[in-house]
Amino acid sequence: MAENSFKNVSTQPKPFFLLPVKTLFLLGGVFSAFFILIFGLVFFDYANSMDNAIFNLMRSNSSNPILDQTLRCVVFLGSSQFVLPLSLLVGVFLSLYRRNLALGVWFVLSVILFEALLKSLKHLFLHSFQWLSHSVNFPSAIALSLTLFYGLLILLIPHFIAHQIFQNILSYSLLGLILLIGLALIVLGVSFSSVLGGFCLGALGACFSIGIYLSVFQKI
């Protein structure tokens, strides 16, 4: 009887977001390749026409102040002003409530370090590619912040919530929020290439961060 119950538990499918270390590094490499590709399109001025076409497709000529204000409120959920304080709260929660000081510190440092990396990249673009007027916003700071923060949460959820239905609801809700904020950014005038570049940087940061943590500490 006990043997049968053990088999039933062991044959249960693992949650999609409960990824092994090698898969996390592989995904990080894929997102890195996508970022390099997008950077190449921006650098050689191939992305401008694509950005304009996507913006014109998603935004009509007439501006709606109420819509703009609503979209700015949505975008605020991915801004540094919202993400950084929230990451500190998550870090405190992981350190005290979950009694995992290393993970709490690691979570906060991951968000802060990639925020610093973004500022360095934007500084590089501003001084090196001034002749590309649309590259000033590449990559999008908000897109990177929201993808990194919510991506880390998505990867951590399966480790803390046992019920798979709740795991899926939370994980896909956060994915939907990432896409919603990205669409809001494009409608407000941020170029598609900048948003996509921020997505790729944030996603590779989340994958590499959790992958390195699991490599060092073996478990969460």
Roles of regions detected by a PLM:
Residues 35-42, 115, 119, 123, ...:
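Short hydrophobic alpha-helical membrane-anchoring segments
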